[in-house]
Amino acid sequence: MAQLIDGKVISTKIKDEVKEKVAGLKEQGCEVTLAVIQVGADPASSVYVRNKKKACEYVGIRSLAYELPEETTEEKLLELIRELNDRTDVNGILVQLPLPKHIDEEKVLDSISPLKDVDGFHPRNVGALCIGKPGFVSCTPAGVIQLLKRSGIEIAGKECVVVGRSNIVGKPMALLLLRENGTVTVAHSRTKDLKEVTKRADILVVA
C-alpha cells in the first residue's frame, strides 16, 4: 500500500535539529561556514543558490557567496577553490552545477578538499561510500534515506529499484540503500522491460 510522505514537515524537523547543533558549536567558539560558488547566471542555478542561502540563514550557518561571471577561466576558479581549501574559517565548499562548457567540471570537483566537499562528489568521498566508510554523501540520496527512515519505512530486506545511474543521484542512492540492507536493482536507459522491473519494487526511487 502506497504511503504519502510529507517532505516539508520532515525537512523542517531536520533543519531544526541542525540549527540546534550549529548553536552548540557556536557556544564552543566554532562558527560553521559554507562557501558557495556560482559561475554564470543560469536561472535555475540562481534559484538553488538562493535556497541554500536561506537554509543556511535558518540554521545559523554563515554562508559566503562567490558569484563569478560566465567568462571566468578554469584556472581562476581553481585558484579560488585552492584559497578556500586553505582557509581555516571555511568548513564546506559547494560549487553550483552545471558549469560553463569551457570549464572541466570533473577537474573542478576533484580540486575541492575531501574534508570540505559537502556535496560528496570528490573521488575520496565516493570511494568511502562504496566501502561503507564515513564521508560526505551526495545530498539528494542522503535526503531520500532520511525521508524513508523518518517515515518509519523499513529498508532492510525490501526490493529497492533505482531508476537512473548518474554519479550525483542514481549510483550513490543505490549504495546507500545497500548500506541499509535493501535488495537493490539499478535500472537505466538500456534496461529491458522497465515496467516489469519497477512493478516488483517495494521502494522505487526515480533518480
Where are these regions (language model features)?
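Positively charged, low-complexity intrinsically disordered leader regions
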Residues: 1-28
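Short beta-strand elements in bilobed, periplasmic/extracellular small-molecule ligand-binding domains
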Residues: 56-71, 184-186
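Short beta-strand segments enriched in small/hydrophobic residues
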Residues: 32-40
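Short acidic/histidine-rich motifs immediately flanking catalytic phosphotransfer sites
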Residues: 86-91, 200-203
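Short beta-strand segments
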Residues: 38, 94-98, 163
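Anion-binding alpha/beta catalytic cores of soluble intermediary-metabolism enzymes, centered on
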Residues: 94-156, 173, 194-197
